[in-house]
């Protein structure tokens, strides 16, 4: 599922999702992407927005939206979407000219509907269908979006694996990361301080350190 961050409007907390999720195939083979609305209470998909990636649609996108966000005649105003969210979801695809890999992008800007209480019963997710043996990696904009299974079976949690910068991926580049040696530190006032919400785990990769397994199998960083 695509998770966002909290925003307060008129004393109520809503979830704002804004940014892109990009999906890369391991080669030029197209695949199918579905953005979905999922009822967390009932445990089922309530609506699907499907976009296949045949050659004739390469370089194009399709948007589904609430009425106030319609920009062109091609945008589809969807009543089911509008019942639970304000905003839009768009899906498009192309072939990366540098790597030759097929990729798709989910462009999302949604806010829980202001016409009902922010019960958070509905989530936005995506389903990918590829061919046998095909590998597809998904990357979310980490400053505004995250990927979460919400504890539902059959869905996948996101991770920071793959967050390493492309500047570190050169074959003659030494990539140095960081690990957590302690979860608290002393200050000049004589007290020790910690930051529990930062996710610091002694002996593990630090949250500020990117890492990942590249498509050619290399694991970065080289040094922690």
Each language-model region and where it sits:
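Loop-rich non-cytosolic ectodomains and luminal regions
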Residues: 1-224
């Amino acid at each position: 599922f695509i998770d966002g961050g909290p925003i307060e409007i008129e004393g109520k907390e809503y979830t704002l999702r804004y940014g892109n999720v990009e999906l890369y195939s391991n080669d030029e083979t197209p695949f199918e992407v579905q953005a979905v609305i999922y009822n967390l209470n009932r445990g089922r998909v309530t609506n699907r927005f499907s976009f296949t990636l045949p050659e004739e649609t390469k370089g194009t996108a399709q948007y589904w939206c609430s009425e106030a966000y319609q920009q062109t005649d091609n945008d589809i105003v969807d009543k089911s979407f509008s019942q639970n969210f304000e905003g839009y979801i768009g899906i498009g695809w192309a072939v990366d000219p540098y790597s030759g890999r097929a990729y798709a992008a989910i462009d999302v800007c949604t806010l829980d509907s202001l016409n009902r209480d922010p019960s958070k019963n509905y989530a936005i997710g995506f389903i990918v269908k590829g061919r046998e043996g095909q590998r597809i990696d998904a990357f979310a904009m980490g400053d505004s979006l995250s990927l979460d299974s919400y504890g539902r079976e059959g869905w996948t949690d996101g991770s920071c694996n793959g967050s390493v910068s492309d500047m570190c991926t050169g074959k003659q580049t030494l990539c140095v990361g960081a690990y957590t040696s302690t979860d608290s530190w002393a200050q000049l006032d004589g007290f020790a301080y910690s930051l529990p919400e930062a996710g610091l785990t002694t002996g593990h990769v630090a949250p500020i350190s990117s890492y990942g397994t590249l498509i050619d199998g290399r694991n970065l960083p080289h040094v922690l």
